Amino acid sequence: MAHPIDIHVGKRIRLRRTLLGMSQEAIGAAIGVSFQQVQKYERGVNRVGASRLFEFSKILDAPVSYFFRRV
């Protein structure tokens, strides 16, 4: 069962990605994972580690704190 925080972070990743018009394939290629892995992160199925979240923050041009807003 996914933890509510993991689900929230995943939703924030998806929101930011879609606001920037990026595909799951593009962001996956940028951080070195498959688009399927990006899907799992966005659904909260797989937990995003600290280093991976830092990569997301750079690529999505958002501070790490962005992903925890409104928790």
Describe the role of every protein-language-model region.
Residues 1-8:
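A detector for short, charged/polar N-terminal pre-domain segments
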